[in-house]
Amino acid sequence: MGETIASKEMHEYFDELEARLKKAIEIANTARARGGDPKPVVEIPLAKDLADRVENLIGVEGVAAKIRVLEEKMSREECALEIGRQVAEGEVGNFATKKDAVEAAIRVSMAVITEGVVAAPIEGINKVELGKNDDGSEYIRIFYSGPIRSAGGTAQALSVLVGDYVRRGIGIDRYKPRPEEVERYVEEIVLYKRVASLQYMPSEDEIRLIVKNCPVCIDGDPTEEAEVEGHRNLERIGTNRIRGGMCLVLAEGLALKAPKVKKHVNKLNMDGWDWLDILIGGAKTGGDEEDEKKNKIKPKDKYIRDLIAGRPVFSHPSRPGGFRLRYGRSRNTSFAAAGINPSTMVLLDDFITNGTQLKVERPGKAAAMSAVDSIEGPTVRLYSGDLVRIDDIKEAYELRSQVEVIVDIGEILINYGDFLENNHPLMPSPYVFEWWRYDYEAACSEIIPEDELKDPSSALALRLAEEYDVPLHPKFTYLWHDINRTEFEALRKFVVGRGNFSVEDEILRLPLKACIENGVKLILEKLLVLHRVKADTILIKEALPFILCLGLDCHLKEKAPMPDTDNMVNATAFLSGFKVLPRAPSRIGARMGRPEKANLRKMSPAAQVLFPIGNAGGLTRNLVSASNYSVSMNGKIGEIEVEMGIRECPACGKETYFWRCDCGEYTRPKLFCPRCKIEVRNSETCPKCGRKPTSVSNVKLDFRSIYKRAFENVGEREKMDLIKGVKRLMNGQMTPEPLEKGILRAKHDVYIFKDGTVRYDMSDIPLTHVRADEIGITAAKLRELGYVEDIYGNPLERDDQIVCLKVQDLVISYDGGGYMLRTAQYVDDLLVKYYGVEPYYNAKTIQDLVGVLLIGLAPHTSAGVLGRLIGFTRASVGYAHPFFHASKRRNCDGDEDCVMLLMDGILNFSRAYLPEKRGGKMDAPLVLTTRIDPKEVDKEAHNIDLPARYPLEFYRATQEIKNPTELEGIMDLVSSRLGTPEQYEHFMFTHDTSDIAAGPLNSSYKTLGSMIDKMEAQLSLANKIRAVDAPDVAERVLKSHFLPDLLGNLRSFSRQRMRCIKCGAKFRRPPLTGACPKCGGNVVLTVHEGAVRKYLEISKEIGKRYGVSSYTQQRIELLDKDICSLFENHRVKQLGISDFMSGSAR
């Protein structure tokens, strides 16, 4: 590995982390040598760089050194292709067959492309085989599976390119598909789109084009239950079921990422890929993209197409009153996270808080929210008639009950880097203080205090505008572009005729009743002209700039005639005589996505130890119950029947079910043929029938004695009520964890994941700068952690100084801190009572955890990242440096990851516990990255901008809707610092925030009870927000959520299975006896009438209340009839003679 390019302080930081890691591994190795773990040493290999990760993940020796050499002179993608060729041709690694070499080459190449982090190279490619063309030549078949999705479209597509690249090097022919195979691909992908989901759906002709011309056969394992109907039982396709991996690679890979594949094909001068030009040309840019190229930003409604009940719409696409775009980066935004004022969070009924995901109109698809109180909050009309802007969260809490209408929901802070990452044209910037300041500095040398510049009086703003030709200050620039000429003239006429302006107090008075009757009150609200209502009079303070913009003088007399223009911004500039610029030219629509998360990770159902107890533990899988279980009255107490792997000790020959024998020797599987029942030694197949041998069998286990001995081994009393095990093990050898670990976990109330580690999940939020006082520690503690100065170079002495966060430091929620404290106490108990070594953490409070090492790990990946805990936050999120998130191949658009204590991870993790199924190695720390190199993290992090203020050229360029790539040269980006010490340090930000955790602690989506309550809250908020069309929201929720649910549940009711409430066995139809044939328990329905009806009444009520379309109303009525016909008893009532005589029969 090349030397890390960093300052002396950063080198000391990395060295300290690695020294502590090394010490922890020594302690863990000593402990594991004494215990009953699968191996006596730590099973997570360390990796300092990408090359190490790839070698450890794929297991091809010598590949790391080659990658380091290639990386010096090639791009990442070129390096991946070249290392693939070298592996395939035998320059690296030793392989028995040509097929094995090709398979290893493709896996290694994909691992390089995905930074050696995701599991796709080992889980997403099941196998590679050589097939036969009809002319007798060979071709490559790559069998993809579901986990290939985690690689991303580009890596999926490039894996196919790698296959072509390496086949040429070793003389394998191209794939020549038969016509029926081409049509099978078309049918299969269309069907997959219906039963699963695709980000991009190519046309049938595009699918045919790809299959006919792709030189590698894109094959796959069956992943869905659905089968094709037309092109079945094909000779060279081994299944009639849908191959999900194939569909993903062809549609989201080659079809969607064709331009990127073409770029690499051109670089490498590869022939046979000319058909990509047809594919790229066929995917015409239309609609939105064409309009944006013509300097028009067209509204996009994609983000509200699939609305979910209970998750509100905050703004319809680009609608006035919605989020106003503001460019910039706070210390807790960027990398797909955006900032809003915490007052906005409060006044949107607490649906948004830190970490809440919003589905947004642009620049990307989604963004996690962060609190930034230096930008503008919402403007609201109170029941009193006042129009006020609320920037302070305390005021928001005080006034929230008085809000009648949210006229404008405030600003949303999005950084330039997110537009660059998404390659989205820059939207026109509003005229904000940052831009105005450039104009002021260029025109005026007069020194004015900073506070006055930010919040000037009307006199100062007008003086600067008139004397120095500086555009009118944003404070007094209203949203003139939101009204039309008719409204402008009506407002002007009304102010002339009915207004009363006092020069002394600068208040414009307007009669309230007349304002309402003439629509002037509404026009003032559209303009965001703040005002109070007192004694039936509207009072507008500091009104002179407003009056002048109407073309009036201080006596409310017209100074100039109305210009001949429909652009009201230009009109105000003409009438006033000074420059006026647009205040909010760009709006961004948004709705709620996922709520924020900060919670412990549990398996479903939860477990505290990977020890099987079958049905003996009941529905709760309780080991305590299993220890007292008896099959019958006369049965042996604690004897249970479970499926386990039989093992034997090579030293003493004893048969056991554990990794280690009582004599101290490590055991090995005792293999036998499942058909012949004969023992198999030193062979991979049965010598009699050729079947693969196994060690797994149903055994009768004296669990009570194992249970009692485990308590004795750790010195605990049998006073526990609940210790949660598992019904059945999922690992290949079916060998359990030591039971002692489960006892200690239950004592400390912690739960494990599939690999034996204790984890805590949190939504990802970026953080580049932090203050001691907002993360629950002191400046002194920060100094202990190696922070010596603030961002301005001053010595770190006060708790409120801002420091630049080090790349592997994390801040977790207080709740997470409490869970990590329990985990630390469990680990110490484990070290002392089970392993017999000294405790490691000695933690009594969460403050004792500050400075401990953690492992960060993202779902669908296989590489953990070493981190250090430096503090806690009230917010339900995990704050970390963008590079830390990027090193896990995550961004901050609403993703969530987990952390685990380092000692817990290295002590308890084992590959032997991972499920033996496709995807089993995902979400497991198969390798640990010890040092983050910015060059090797996900490239999205390279687009983060770092200046303290954006240049003036940037604001001007946005008015021309330029492509963000045109401005890379003038912006201070991470990419421009790579390879220098500045890649880690001296980052800045444009907008500060007083508290990163400001705002509600939890989204009301999580705190509200039933779905009906959430839906009512969603519609109540929609009625309150000016930028939202409530009837449209109601219709969309019915069509995309409630009606599909009602239909699905109705269908499920008719197809349901039966379930035993005692043992959980399921049956396609009820047993004739009505009792479970396995255990005698009651058999019940799995889908009940209540589940089918649950959304029916609310759907009917909402349909009427909001006047949804007649089509939707009729769908609801038809469903109502279907449900009634299924559940209501329409049998004819038996009538007696008396009923006829009394006439009641009529």
Swiss-Prot record:
GO MF, one annotated term: DNA-directed DNA polymerase activity
Keyword line: DNA replication, DNA-binding, DNA-directed DNA polymerase, Exonuclease, Hydrolase, Multifunctional enzyme, Nuclease, Nucleotidyltransferase, Transferase
Catalysed reaction equations from the record: DNA(n) + a 2'-deoxyribonucleoside 5'-triphosphate = DNA(n+1) + diphosphate; Exonucleolytic cleavage in the 3'- to 5'-direction to yield nucleoside 5'-phosphates
A Pfam family reported for this protein in Swiss-Prot or TrEMBL: PolC_DP2_cat
EC number: 2.7.7.7, 3.1.11.1
GO BP annotations, alphabetical order: DNA catabolic process; DNA-templated DNA replication
Domain of life: Archaea
Cited HAMAP family: DNApol_II_L_arch (MF_00324)
Family: Belongs to the archaeal DNA polymerase II family.
Function: Possesses two activities: a DNA synthesis (polymerase) and an exonucleolytic activity that degrades single-stranded DNA in the 3'- to 5'-direction. Has a template-primer preference which is characteristic of a replicative DNA polymerase.
Subunit structure: Heterodimer of a large subunit and a small subunit.
Name listed for the protein in its UniProt record: DNA polymerase II large subunit
Organism encoding this protein: Methanosarcina barkeri (strain Fusaro / DSM 804)
Gene behind the chain: polC
